[in-house]
């Protein structure tokens, strides 16, 4: 009996514990379930808000892009953002689309003027959180690209003397000397036998010119037919989107794992060399050693230094000059060669104009090359069909909001004009996907009357790294002279495998620099 009583007591205690533990277990299950499902519920509620109640909910665009920035980042990392946004504008048949929960893309010249041309105090500030230029600060310093509006104004004033009419005239010797060196190299027998990567030759030319203009000393790229830093710049193009991704999600520490070590070390070497050259150039100016030498950018900047720029300011500007200037001209001249050589009629018109006007190579000067209307039209059409910066450099709408293209946009929204999309949509251009230089020669009513040339003009005035307003005239001078001399001296044809060069290009804020193989034969 005592044993039976003990068994009964144990049974009762066990049942009592089970009664207590069951609610606890149920409660823990509910908590676990809530923890697991709460992110899903949060995502669904947030998605409904973005799609139905958000101020941008009535703008056209893909729904998945409207509820998350993940699609934007994924496509950007693939190098397809410029092409995809162009396709979305065409798909929705709209000049404005929503490309992220808080971002709009426009294609009109009026939007471009509003976003990039509104003066202070309502100026749209550059978006530096990873959607545009990233990172904003390197080694605890901002560049001219990412400076505050106040500091940017100071740097612009300091740059103005270097881009005066007199300064542009003085640049003729720089352009002519290096262009003649390019022609001399291409005339060597070894370069007429095999196919040549014309993009590399244009890169060597542009890098030499920009280095000479920035430091008063050429880099010697054309003489050596090599420049290791060019390869570094090319490899770093793809890293731009990773910088954007890391900065946006505040995980910059991840960059050391995804960036090639060789590229990071080469970048550091280049920065050290650039700083050394800037310091040498400043010392030359102060000691009077530049007396009688050609005037470069630093001659004008240091000779009119009312802003008391530091060595680091000059270093930042010199680096930006070289990267922005060489990128724009290298890509545009390569694309020009592709589009012109792809169309036999256009090619025939270009060489006829150049060769009929000049009896000899020495007759081709910067001024004379500016008097080639068809060549100029081909450059303009190249920059329209394949703009050097195909994506947008977005800006913030200030608190209180702004009206853009007749519709109110709330503060805190990111807005921008994606250049490739704006240049390819049929409401801006007639026959937009065709290379037609004649559209720039039309002076009367005709087929291309309604082309939005104001849009193209604005592109030349606003940022390609915040320097285009200064560099556009210089770049046009360089391109007209170099292309006139090239097509006067040589017969050029695309290689058999170059037909898809343009349409297969990736973009990482700027275009990927894919080789363009051509055959170059001297005329005589």
Curated annotation (Swiss-Prot):
GO terms for cellular component: membrane. CDD domains: CYP60B-like (cd11058). Pathway: Secondary metabolite biosynthesis. Pfam families: p450 (PF00067). Its cofactor is heme. Its main location: membrane. It is a single-pass membrane protein. GO terms for molecular function: heme binding; iron ion binding; monooxygenase activity; oxidoreductase activity, acting on paired donors, with incorporation or reduction of molecular oxygen. The chain crosses the membrane at residues 24-44. It is found in: Membrane. Keywords: Heme, Iron, Membrane, Metal-binding, Monooxygenase, Oxidoreductase, Transmembrane, Transmembrane helix. Heme binds at residue 469. Its EC number is 1.-.-.-. Cytochrome P450 monooxygenase; part of the gene cluster that mediates the biosynthesis of alternapyrone derivatives. Alternapyrone is a decaketide with octa-methylation from methionine on every C2 unit except the third unit. All the domains in the polyketide synthase alt5 are apparently involved in alternapyrone synthesis, that is, the 8 CMeT, 7 KR, 7 DH, and 4 ER reactions in the 9 KS-mediated condensation steps required for alternapyrone synthesis. Belongs to the cytochrome P450 family. This is Cytochrome P450 monooxygenase alt1. The gene is alt1.
